[in-house]
């Protein structure tokens, strides 16, 4: 597992959306707002509308998450392996968030937990695509 440094974690925590990309029978990229960096440095995404994403993760487990740009040019891309879970404290957290936002009409089915393996700079400039 690649440890995320403080500046990456800060950006991930402050961005309103992450973009999650997967590949399988079809490539898929979607914005996600139900997200968190876990205490152990993994990335968690609430599975509210992630049907194609979860199909692709079941195929090969490969996930890319990109975040940044809402408050400047700084951005990162995190590549890793995803695992879908349907119970536990993080799932309960996302269910509560979805219930509050959607007034019980939609809920989180589970959570996609991404173990980071590589972090790349996605900021324009000479360090673009450099691995941290």
Predicted feature locations:
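Binding-site signature for planar aromatic cofactors or substrates
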Residues: 1-132
């Amino acid at each position: 597992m690649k440890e995320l440094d403080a500046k990456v974690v800060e950006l991930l925590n402050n961005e309103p959306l992450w973009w999650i990309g997967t590949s399988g029978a079809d490539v898929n990229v979607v914005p996600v707002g139900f997200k968190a960096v876990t205490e152990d440095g993994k990335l968690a995404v609430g599975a509210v509308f992630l049907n194609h994403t979860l199909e692709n993760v079941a195929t090969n487990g490969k996930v890319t998450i990109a975040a940044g740009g809402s408050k400047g040019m700084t951005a990162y891309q995190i590549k890793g392996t995803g695992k879908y879970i349907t119970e536990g404290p993080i799932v309960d957290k996302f269910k509560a968030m979805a219930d509050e936002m959607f007034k019980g009409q939609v809920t989180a089915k589970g959570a996609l937990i991404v173990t980071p393996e590589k972090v790349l700079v996605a900021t324009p400039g000479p360090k673009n695509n450099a691995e941290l």
